[in-house]
Amino acid sequence: MALRFPRFSQGLAQDPTTRRIWFGIATAHDFESHDDITEERLYQNIFASHFGQLAIIFLWTSGNLFHVAWQGNFESWVQDPLHVRPIAHAIWDPHFGQPAVEAFTRGGALGPVNIAYSGVYQWWYTIGLRTNEDLYTGALFLLFLSSISLTAGWLHLQPKWKPSVSWFKNAESRLNHHLSGLFGVSSLAWTGHLVHVAIPGSRGEYVRWNNFLDVLPHPQGLGPLFTGQWNLYAQNPDSSSHLFGTSQGAGTAILTLLGGFHPQTQSLWLTDIAHHHLAIAFIFLVAGHMYRTNFGIGHSMKDLLEAHIPPGGRLGRGHKGLYDTINNSIHFQLGLALASLGVITSLVAQHMYSLPAYAFIAQDFTTQAALYTHHQYIAGFIMTGAFAHGAIFFIRDYNPEQNEDNVLARMLDHKEAIISHLSWASLFLGFHTLGLYVHNDVMLAFGTPEKQILIEPIFAQWIQSAHGKTSYGFDVLLSSTNGPAFNAGRSIWLPGWLNAINENSNSLFLTIGPGDFLVHHAIALGLHTTTLILVKGALDARGSKLMPDKKDFGYSFPCDGPGRGGTCDISAWDAFYLAVFWMLNTIGWVTFYWHWKHITLWQGNVSQFNESSTYLMGWLRDYLWLNSSQLINGYNPFGMNSLSVWAWMFLFGHLVWATGFMFLISWRGYWQELIETLAWAHERTPLANLIRWRDKPVALSIVQARLVGLAHFSVGYIFTYAAFLIASTSGKFG
């Protein structure tokens, strides 16, 4: 008999039902569960798949460059970044006739196009690209990298090139390679690009391979570096009247600490950015050389962790046993990596708008909104994934003997205290925040808005003042002109920073009031509840009072059969599943808050946010309803407009989102009955009954149906908000 799918599991391949297909897809990437898997093959498979991932990323970014070069308007955008709308790519086949063609022909294009809200134009412009030829060259280079990655992936699956397990578990060498080799060297290389290409480009000098060796990035060359007069590289920076991309008002400095923003582009000074990357490179190059590799010098990670025993005794045996636990568990390592990446992605969202690095991106409001929202959602999914793999670690990889009385074991020992504290925090935040909102709603409903409970966020305002914001009148730290902090920075970065933080047209340290106080606590509620569900799922993954042998059932199980009531919905997977809803909920509040506050800031009517954000009806009426008018008007009796596609996506997103509930509410029995009825009808219908299947149709398991429901809910939720965000912002600001 021919090998049936899935080849990695003979047990599943012989299953006579459609379960074979669905379980096969579900476990395709769970290499640990495959037949004949060894630890060595597991590591090699994962390692090789990383190269495939890199190849896809390079191919995708190459496609971005290629399509903009081919169908975009990069060269005309470069001439006037503030008024030309950047084109992402052409629309091949515009449906709905002539009105659609006219509606989508914009940005100086000859036919229908999509506008780019990704910020790539601003990024490419800032790093020194100027022509379509530059874009094509970049696309070809990335295509080359993509094919190299694919080749490397294939190569590392060949017997001669397969690394051994000991190579994968050599933690110090991996740290050396990642910290120094990847982060350190790439940061240094990026500094080099900024200094040699981007900064001259911002001063109107076009540096390419043909003149790269002739153009000195700094008039004094490498002299100051070798004589130790590094401060010369910071002298004569660009002036405040500098026109980006030209020599008008340009200086000669390459590494500065000016602080604040370039007045024309409203983005960080490129010379400050180069300085930052050089510092990062230095730190990582040093960090990567601190651990003992082939030369017998430096720290051993194992020795470090074994020595970490707090003397007070309150943390037991401290970090003893952690080295082997982490180094032998791929899930623990993945959990750590995802947690770090999730935090970084959220930080990227926060910093991209408050400290924009790319020229003119701060004035492209739709792009700012899209990038913030995109990065926050990505961060949410990555963070929940971190806890999922943390739970899988506890089920598959945790060894109690190896971790006796260390910090990991102690987390499990006092999990009741952790979970109940999180529960208490969530309840406190939820009841008090909702109570304040609802009280304010009632006061407005009865026509007595002056009876609202409005709380000034004085602690947050004090923190903003400490960073130099003067409008609140706190005379503290950087907002006090006679303190040591103020005097220390006055000659370098401080004037630029103070100018930026007290300027009302950017997004740096926005003025906050009672509406911000309330939504801050609503978001805190969402964060604590999401954390509660995820932490409980991981800490109870091995077992609980209700089900002490839970770890024997694996990561996801629906229920444990008759006679053990209450064991439904308590697998670690169920906790992850529930937490994703709360994560989406929380990021909804975060993005609503960000978007509404910024819309009013950009339109110059900040009072709308300040007055309406203190009660729920204000959010529903003055943010959601008021800003969805563009979507509801996307097509009307007078034909189409350029927002029609978003109006359609808004409806379609709602549809996908609502479909999720169908899977979330009706469970396995319903689908099984439905499928059997459909199969019966199929077999008795002429022509249709000529098509037969080998597998007996079986409904999805409860766990799978929940996954399908969750996927529809998440995708629909994000599609709906993406359409709302882009249409309402671009409808106002073009």
Swiss-Prot record:
Keywords from the UniProt entry: 4Fe-4S, Chlorophyll, Chloroplast, Chromophore, Electron transport, Iron, Iron-sulfur, Magnesium, Membrane, Metal-binding, Oxidoreductase, Photosynthesis, Photosystem I, Plastid, Thylakoid, Transmembrane, Transmembrane helix, Transport
HAMAP family with a match to the protein in the record: PSI_PsaB (MF_00482)
Topology in membrane: Multi-pass membrane protein
Catalytic reaction list: reduced [plastocyanin] + hnu + oxidized [2Fe-2S]-[ferredoxin] = oxidized [plastocyanin] + reduced [2Fe-2S]-[ferredoxin]
Transferase is among the record's keywords: no
One example GO MF annotation: oxidoreductase activity
Binding of chlorophyll a B1, residues: H654
Positions contributing to chlorophyll a B3 binding: M662, Y670
Matching PANTHER family: OUTER MEMBRANE PROTEIN, OMPA-RELATED, PHOTOSYSTEM I P700 CHLOROPHYLL A APOPROTEIN A1-RELATED
Bilayer-crossing regions: 46-69, 135-158, 175-199, 273-291, 330-353, 369-395, 417-439, 517-535, 575-596, 643-665, 707-727
Enzyme class (EC, first level): oxidoreductase
Enzyme Commission number: 1.97.1.12
Main localization category: plastid
Domain of life: Eukaryota
Species in which this protein is naturally found: Buxus microphylla (Littleleaf boxwood)
An example Gene Ontology CC term for this record: chloroplast thylakoid membrane
The keyword Isomerase appears for this protein: no
Pfam families (alphabetical): PsaA_PsaB (PF00223)
Protein name listed in UniProt: Photosystem I P700 chlorophyll a apoprotein A2
Recorded family membership: Belongs to the PsaA/PsaB family.
Compartment list: Plastid, Chloroplast thylakoid membrane
Subunit note: The PsaA/B heterodimer binds the P700 chlorophyll special pair and subsequent electron acceptors. PSI consists of a core antenna complex that captures photons, and an electron transfer chain that converts photonic excitation into a charge separation. The eukaryotic PSI reaction center is composed of at least 11 subunits.
Taxon lineage: Eukaryota, Viridiplantae, Streptophyta, Embryophyta, Tracheophyta
